[in-house]
Regions:
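A generic structural motif
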Residues: 1, 46-47, 125
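Catalytic-core segments of hydrolase enzymes
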Residues: 119-205
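Short gly/ser/thr-rich secondary-structure transition/capping motifs
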Residues: 2-7, 173-175
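Short, well-structured alpha-helical segments in soluble
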Residues: 109-117
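Subtilisin-like serine protease catalytic core
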Residues: 8-104, 117-121, 131-133, 159-162, ...
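Stable alpha-helical elements in mature extracytoplasmic
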Residues: 5-8, 63-67, 103-110, 145, ...
Length: 205
């Protein structure tokens, strides 16, 4: 409760109704059978990785489903996510088992698709540092304007100040990288990093 401020949210009688949320991830497996997400209103979904659209919610990767649980998960009167009444748009732009540089472009295509649906909030769990061909970036480039995605988002969010873009910090906090991944370095992006129950962060700014 302390980390999500759900008591304050409940006191205002909010549910996310009237809000359009776009979610960018590597898979939404089990979305329609999971107890926390099967009741969410999904207005549209799309796969930008060349996968089978008919098998979108049967994907082997369920990270996006877990994210949606945190955003709006609800089972009966038990609530896991605060925006259980929002309208959701799901975009798969990444395949978890590979890291080609093309996934940067796929993520941008996913964002453009979400914008065409006039979403209010975009949540992305996808960040990049090094690709399968050993190309990539260095921590010195974390300036909000060097990487392909950082340049794109800096321009987009400057032009659309009302759009909320939430980005995961990345999973390299306890690895050699030790910093956020791109595009979490963009100043207008709301970057979320993980912490334990004691409030200790895994990733340095």
């Amino acid at each position: 409760v302390g980390q999500t401020m759900s008591r304050a949210f409940d006191s205002l009688n909010l549910s996310g109704r009237g809000v359009r949320i776009g979610v960018l991830d590597a898979g939404f497996g089990g979305f329609r059978t999971d107890r926390w997400t099967r009741g969410l209103h999904v207005a549209a979904w799309r796969d930008f990785t060349g996968g089978d659209e008919t098998a979108f919610i049967d994907d082997a990767t369920d990270h996006g489903t877990r994210v949606c649980t945190n955003l709006g998960g609800r089972s009966g009167d038990t609530i896991r996510g605060l925006a259980w009444g929002a309208e959701y748009y799901l975009a798969k732009t990444d395949r978890a088992e590979v890291e080609p540089r093309a996934e940067e472009r796929q993520l941008i295509r996913g964002i453009e698709w979400l914008l065409a649906h006039d979403v209010d909030v975009i949540s992305s769990s996808l960040g990049y540092t090094t690709f399968d061909d050993f190309s990539g970036y260095t921590p010195a480039m974390l300036d909000g304007r060097t990487s392909t995605l950082s340049r794109y988002l800096d321009s987009l969010l400057t032009a659309r100040p009302g759009l909320v873009f939430v980005q995961s910090a990345g999973n390299a906090g306890d690895q050699a990288w030790r910093h956020v991944s791109f595009p979490a370095d963009v100043p207008q992006v709301l970057t979320v990093r993980s912490c334990d129950s004691g409030g200790h962060y895994r990733t340095r700014p």
